[in-house]
C-alpha cells in the first residue's frame, strides 16, 4: 500500500510497521534491547503504536524457529512498511522477510532513514539561532 505523510495508507487506515532484524546467533537480551530501541524510535518519530516487534510475537522464546517465522510472516502480511535493522544481510530470517515484503510490494526502509526523519523533525522545530559573541 502507498502511504501518505500523515501516517495513513491511501485507503485511510493507520500505517502498520514491521521490524526486521537478525535474532538467531545473538544474545537474546542484546536483541531485545536493540529491537525495543527501534520500536520506540518508530513510535516516537511517526506517532504510532502499530509496530510489530518479532521479539514480542507472543510465542515462547524456545518455540521452534519455523513457528517464529510463520508468526512473523503472518504479521508481515498485515504490514505496510518494513524497517530493516543493521545486519539483515547476514540473517536467513531477515532475507526471507525482505523477499516476502518485496513480493507484497511493501515499502522497505533502513533504520537510519527513521533516524534521519527524527533529525529533520528536530531541526524543523528547533531552528538554528545566530551565534552572538
Describe these PLM feature segments.
Residues 1-133:
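Conserved catalytic or regulatory cores that recognize and/or transform ribose-phosphate-containing ligands
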Amino acid at each position: 500500500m502507498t502511504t501518505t505523510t500523515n501516517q495513513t495508507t491511501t485507503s485511510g487506515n493507520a500505517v502498520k510497521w514491521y521490524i526486521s532484524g537478525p535474532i538467531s546467533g545473538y544474545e537474546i537480551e542484546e536483541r531485545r534491547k536493540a529491537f525495543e530501541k527501534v520500536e520506540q524510535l518508530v513510535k516516537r518519530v511517526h506517532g504510532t503504536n502499530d509496530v510489530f516487534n518479532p521479539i514480542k510475537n507472543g510465542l515462547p522464546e524456545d518455540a521452534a524457529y519455523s513457528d517464529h517465522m510463520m508468526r512473523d510472516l503472518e504479521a508481515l502480511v498485515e504490514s505496510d512498511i518494513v524497517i530493516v535493522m543493521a545486519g539483515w544481510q547476514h540473517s536467513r530470517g531477515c532475507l526471507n522477510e525482505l523477499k516476502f515484503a518485496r513480493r507484497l510490494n511493501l515499502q522497505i526502509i533502513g533504520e537510519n532513514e527513521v533516524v534521519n526523519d527524527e533529525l529533520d523533525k528536530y531541526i524543523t522545530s528547533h531552528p538554528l539561532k545566530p551565534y552572538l559573541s
